[in-house]
């Protein structure tokens, strides 16, 4: 039977300058503002607001009451043109907020593909989120945070502005990080999170074999358990990286740090 439900609810407000693919659905009382582009297969649920400049890819779902592409919550923002770019296949749950960038922070907020952002998640200005991440309820990313692929952030956890969270990392419930989190690292559920091993279970689920996981564990022990100064730990990691691409990625992440490493 053919679905007779209209694609655009009669109570939705669509700015004439917005560009929506032919099969985009927009629910009741939602607002699509000026300079917004939405790709094919995307569903915008009821009571959502999407402001431009914002570009949204294909097959995304905004469940309801999401506030997307709003002005950055930064007092230095002076109305300059900035944007938000969202990729494909993301699920954005109730009351999620994702803000545009700032002129001083690169001018763009980016969300990749196939991410799940659960209720009340906040992604601030100039954040860059990778692919296949899960942000549980009330996850909070301050401005300029970078999140790698396959990161899981538990409920009520958050990251200080300018922090980086490496690929495959895991932040426990309520964990707050004010330093860079290396790839594969688990952060404990303390008020100020501390390293608590590697995300072994997540790596197994993603197809990492025992040899790769063993190399990552060894690198973690070098960095966090051996009691070495960071400079000495990096020298040992450089040796280990000769036989492990994963360790090489960890070392490159550490070398690129502009904030202190979570220790």
Swiss-Prot record:
Gene3D superfamilies: Hexapeptide repeat proteins, Udp N-acetylglucosamine O-acyltransferase, C-terminal domain. One of its GO terms (cellular component) is membrane. Keywords: Acyltransferase, Cytoplasm, Lipid A biosynthesis, Lipid biosynthesis, Lipid metabolism, Repeat, Transferase. InterPro entries: Acetyltransf_C (IPR029098), Acetyltransf_C_sf (IPR037157), Hexapep (IPR001451), Lipid_A_LpxA (IPR010137), Trimer_LpxA-like_sf (IPR011004). Pfam families: Acetyltransf_11 (PF13720), Hexapep (PF00132). Pathway: Glycolipid biosynthesis; lipid IV(A) biosynthesis; lipid IV(A) from (3R)-3-hydroxytetradecanoyl-[acyl-carrier-protein] and UDP-N-acetyl-alpha-D-glucosamine: step 1/6. The keyword Lipid biosynthesis applies. Its EC number is 2.3.1.129. Disulfide bonds: none annotated. One of its GO terms (molecular function) is acyl-[acyl-carrier-protein]-UDP-N-acetylglucosamine O-acyltransferase activity. Belongs to the transferase hexapeptide repeat family. LpxA subfamily. HAMAP family: LpxA (MF_00387). Homotrimer. Involved in the biosynthesis of lipid A, a phosphorylated glycolipid that anchors the lipopolysaccharide to the outer membrane of the cell. PANTHER family: ACYL-[ACYL-CARRIER-PROTEIN]--UDP-N-ACETYLGLUCOSAMINE O-ACYLTRANSFERASE (PTHR43480), ACYL-[ACYL-CARRIER-PROTEIN]--UDP-N-ACETYLGLUCOSAMINE O-ACYLTRANSFERASE, MITOCHONDRIAL-RELATED (PTHR43480:SF1). This is Acyl-[acyl-carrier-protein]--UDP-N-acetylglucosamine O-acyltransferase. It comes from Xanthomonas axonopodis pv. citri (strain 306).
